[in-house]
From Swiss-Prot:
GO molecular-function term, one example from the UniProt record: structural constituent of ribosome
GO terms under cellular component: cytosolic large ribosomal subunit
Name used for this protein in its record: Large ribosomal subunit protein uL30
Organism this protein belongs to: Clostridium perfringens (strain 13 / Type A)
Keywords: Ribonucleoprotein, Ribosomal protein
Length: 57
């Protein structure tokens, strides 16, 4: 399991990056969600890694 936290604002970001954050369940700064470490999830995390903090859960 991966704990993913949004640490930077989505304001002014590319629309596809905002959509990726929303697909991960991240809408507000400080929100943390847990996801399985599937290739699809890891790809989404990699795409917006500059907005996130990722930890192993």
């Amino acid at each position: 399991m991966l704990k993913v936290t949004l640490v930077k604002s989505l304001i002014g970001r590319k629309k596809d990056h905002i959509a990726t954050a929303h697909a991960l369940g991240l809408r507000k700064i400080g929100k943390t969600v847990e996801h399985e470490g599937t290739p699809q999830i890891k790809g989404m995390i990699n795409k917006i890694s500059y907005l996130l903090k990722v930890e192993e859960a």
